[in-house]
């Protein structure tokens, strides 16, 4: 699966994750996501309310990634935001 990073994701990643202990974990979990986006360990789920139409998966206990799938073939995921539960929801 192809992954793209939105400008808002890149900004949030630099601010909230880069140069922390979570950065290496993020890249490992992203590999898992690319192989199977619905792996049980990721806890991938649809969002509701103001984030309806988006999905989320868990990187660590309190680190989430918000994303959506494009209708392209092959499937492509666009990562929109990353942060704690309170930061992204």
Regions found by a protein language model. Give the residues of each.
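Flexible domain-boundary/linker segments
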Residues: 18, 26, 43-50, 64, ...
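A short, surface-exposed loop/turn module that caps and links secondary-structure elements
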Residues: 32-57
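Enriched for short, Lys/Arg-rich terminal
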Residues: 2, 8-14, 58-89
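A short, hydrophobic secondary-structure junction motif
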Residues: 30, 36, 86-89
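Arg/Lys-rich, positively charged N-terminal/basic patches that mediate binding to nucleic acids
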Residues: 1-29
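Short, charge- and proline-biased low-complexity linear segments
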Residues: 23-32, 77, 82
């Amino acid at each position: 699966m192809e992954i793209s990073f939105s400008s808002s994701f890149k900004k949030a990643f630099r601010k909230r994750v880069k140069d922390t202990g979570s950065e290496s974990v993020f890249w490992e979990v992203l590999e898992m996501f690319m192989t199977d986006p619905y792996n049980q360990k990721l806890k991938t789920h649809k969002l509701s309310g103001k984030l309806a139409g988006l999905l989320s998966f868990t990187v660590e206990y309190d680190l989430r990634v918000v994303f959506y799938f494009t209708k392209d073939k092959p499937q492509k995921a666009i990562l929109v935001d990353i942060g704690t539960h309170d930061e992204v929801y």
